[in-house]
């Protein structure tokens, strides 16, 4: 659930995210400010209002490039944990504030009908900083600090 309000070249989006995890759910409030310029820089701040009781920040850039009838969007981001225990703990088993991950991605949006799109994405993500590496390797299914993954979303805008 989110709402976006354009303010000149800046768009401000706020919303609520519900995460449905095995063994426990959590929810976050978030706000993102994005600037419509070269590389489209954005800053997102998340605050876990349930299980994590902490925050998370993401600084990102992205650029769309025409590719036939579609466009491909290349992106990069850096995540910074702000004592959010839902993101994992450091080697001492404590929440931490510090670098968490870096990610590069490639995505597109394929119109299906009306305001509905199919949005595939691939990405490579790796832990940054020793605390981030400790947290990510502890909660990852394979104990590794990096992952290559893909996703597909169906989006309806109204």
Model-inferred region functions:
Residues 6-10, 36-40, 66-70, 81, ...:
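Outer-membrane beta-barrel channels and translocator barrels
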Residues 1-5, 16, 31-35, 45, ...:
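Residues on the lipid-exposed face of transmembrane beta-strands in outer-membrane beta-barrel proteins
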Residues 104, 109-158:
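Predominantly the C-terminal beta-signal and adjacent terminal strand-loop region
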Residues 1, 10-22, 29, 39-50, ...:
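Transmembrane beta-strand segments that form the barrel wall of outer-membrane beta-barrel proteins
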Residues 12, 23-26, 52-54, 83-87, ...:
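Outer-membrane beta-barrel proteins
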Residues 10, 25-29, 53-57, 98-102, ...:
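Residues that define the transmembrane beta-barrel architecture of outer-membrane proteins
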Residues 64, 73-97, 101:
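A mid-sequence, solvent-exposed acidic-amphipathic segment
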Residues 44-47, 85-95, 134-142:
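Extracellular loop and loop/strand-boundary signature of outer-membrane beta-barrel proteins
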């Amino acid at each position: 659930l989110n709402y976006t309000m354009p303010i000149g070249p800046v768009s401000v989006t706020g919303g609520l995210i519900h995460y449905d995890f095995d063994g426990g759910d959590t929810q976050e409030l978030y706000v993102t400010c994005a600037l419509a310029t070269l590389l489209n820089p954005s800053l997102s701040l998340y605050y876990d209002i349930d299980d994590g009781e902490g925050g998370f920040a993401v600084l990102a850039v992205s650029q769309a490039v025409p590719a036939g009838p579609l466009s491909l969007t290349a992106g990069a981001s850096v995540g910074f944990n702000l004592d959010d225990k839902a993101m994992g703990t450091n080697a001492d088993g404590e929440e931490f504030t510090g670098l968490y991950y870096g990610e590069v991605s490639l995505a597109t949006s394929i119109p299906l009908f009306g305001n509905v799109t199919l949005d595939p994405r691939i990405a490579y993500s790796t832990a940054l900083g020793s605390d981030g590496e400790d947290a990510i390797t502890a909660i990852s299914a394979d104990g590794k600090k990096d992952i290559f993954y893909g996703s597909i979303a169906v989006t309806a805008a109204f």
